[in-house]
Amino acid sequence: MSWWTPQVAAIAFALFQAVVILLAAVGAAALLTMVERRLLGLWQDRHGPNRVGPFGVLQIVADMLKIVFKEDWIPPFADRGLFVLAPAIAMASLLLSFMVIPITPSWGVADLHIGLLFFFAMAGINVYAVLFAGWSSGNKYALLGAMRASAQTLSYEVFMGLSLMGVVAMAGSFNMREIVAAQETLWFIVPQFFGFCTFLVAGIAVTHRHPFDQPEAEQELADGYHIEYSGMKWGMFFVGEYVGIVLVSALMVTLFLGGWHGPWLPPIVWFLLKTAVFVGFFILLRAALPRPRYDAVMSFGWKVCLPLTLINLLVTGALILIFSPAGG
C-alpha cells in the first residue's frame, strides 16, 4: 500500500490513542458515579445502590437508561441556541484537556510544547459553558449559580496557574512529558509541597466539588446553573463533573507525583493507581466536610491561596538562582 506512509501511520496511531483515551475518560467518569455512591454509603454506615444487578454493579446501566429516556425538554423562555450549546462546550473542553496528558512514555495524544497552557485555555473555555447555561435558562437561580460558578472558577484558576509556575521553573518547560521526565529522581510534590496544596484546593474549587460546590448549592440555588436542564443535556453536565475529577487527579499525578514513574510495576499501572488515590480523596471530601459560605470560599482564595502561591514562586525562583550553575 503506497499510501500507507510513516506519516499516515503516525496520524492513525494518534487518532487511535485519542479515541481510547476519550472513551476511557468518559467510562471512568460513568463508573465513578456508582463508586462514589457505594463509598459514601460505606463511610456513612448505610447501604449504597444495591438493587440493580449483583451488588448493584449494573446501577450505571440503569442510570444511563434513565437519562436517555428522560424528556429532553427546553423551556419556552430559554435562549434555545445557547441552551443547547452550553453542555456541549462543557463536555468538549474537558475531554480536549486529556489530549495533553501523557499516560505512559509511549501513550499520549498531543506532545505540545505549551501543553500546560493548552489546559488553562480549555479551563477558560469551560467558564463560557457555565455562563451560557445560566444566562440562557431564563431562571434567576440558574443565573445566580452561573455568576457564582464563573467568579469562583476564574478566581481559583489564577491560584491554580500561579501554583504551577514553580513546577514550570524547576522543569524548565510547559511540556507535560518534559515535566514528568524532570521528576524521574525526585517528585515535585517534595520541593513544591505548598504549590501542590494550592493546586489541590484550586482543583476542587474549579470542578465545583464538595466542599466548594456553592454554584450548585441545592439548599440555596436548587441545583444552580443546570436547574432547567433534563435528559442528555443534564447528563452531559453531570458526567462532565466526574470527568473533571478524573482530569484534575490525572494532572496532579502528572505535575507533582512523577506521572508514570514508579518501581516494579508497569508505567500505566502506576499512573492509574496514583490517579485513583486522588479520585478517592475527592469522594472522601464530600463525605467528611461541610459546605462553607460562598464569601468564605472567595476570601480563602484571595487571602490565603494567592499569598501562598506568590511566596512559593518567590522562594522557588530564589533557590533556582542560587543553586544554578554559574553562567547557566
Swiss-Prot record:
Principal localization reads membrane
In Pfam terms, one family for this protein is NADHdh
What enzyme category does the UniProt record give?
translocase
Q: Classify the protein's membrane topology as the record does.
A: Multi-pass membrane protein
**Could you tell me which InterPro entries the record lists for this protein?**
NADH_UbQ_OxRdtase_su1/FPO (IPR001694), NADH_UbQ_OxRdtase_su1_CS (IPR018086)
The regions listed as transmembrane in this protein's record are: 8-28, 81-101, 114-134, 154-174, 186-206, 237-257, 265-285, 304-324
Please name the GO terms of the biological process aspect recorded for this protein, alphabetically.
aerobic respiration
Alphabetical GO CC annotations of the entry are: plasma membrane
Reactions listed under catalytic activity: a quinone + NADH + 5 H(+)(in) = a quinol + NAD(+) + 4 H(+)(out)
Q: Name its cellular compartments.
A: Cell inner membrane
Q: What is its EC number?
A: 7.1.1.-
* Disulphide bond pairs: none
Q: Which UniProt keywords apply?
A: Cell inner membrane, Cell membrane, Membrane, NAD, Quinone, Translocase, Transmembrane, Transmembrane helix, Ubiquinone
The UniProt GO MF terms for this protein read: NADH dehydrogenase activity; oxidoreductase activity, acting on NAD(P)H, quinone or similar compound as acceptor; quinone binding
**SUBUNIT field:** NDH-1 is composed of 14 different subunits. Subunits NuoA, H, J, K, L, M, N constitute the membrane sector of the complex.
NCBIfam families per the UniProt record, alphabetical: PRK06076.1-1, PRK06076.1-2
Family in the record: Belongs to the complex I subunit 1 family.
Task of the protein: NDH-1 shuttles electrons from NADH, via FMN and iron-sulfur (Fe-S) centers, to quinones in the respiratory chain. The immediate electron acceptor for the enzyme in this species is believed to be ubiquinone. Couples the redox reaction to proton translocation (for every two electrons transferred, four hydrogen ions are translocated across the cytoplasmic membrane), and thus conserves the redox energy in a proton gradient. This subunit may bind ubiquinone.
- Output this protein's name: NADH-quinone oxidoreductase subunit H
Q: Which organism is it from?
A: Chromohalobacter salexigens (strain ATCC BAA-138 / DSM 3043 / CIP 106854 / NCIMB 13768 / 1H11)
Q: Corresponding gene?
A: nuoH
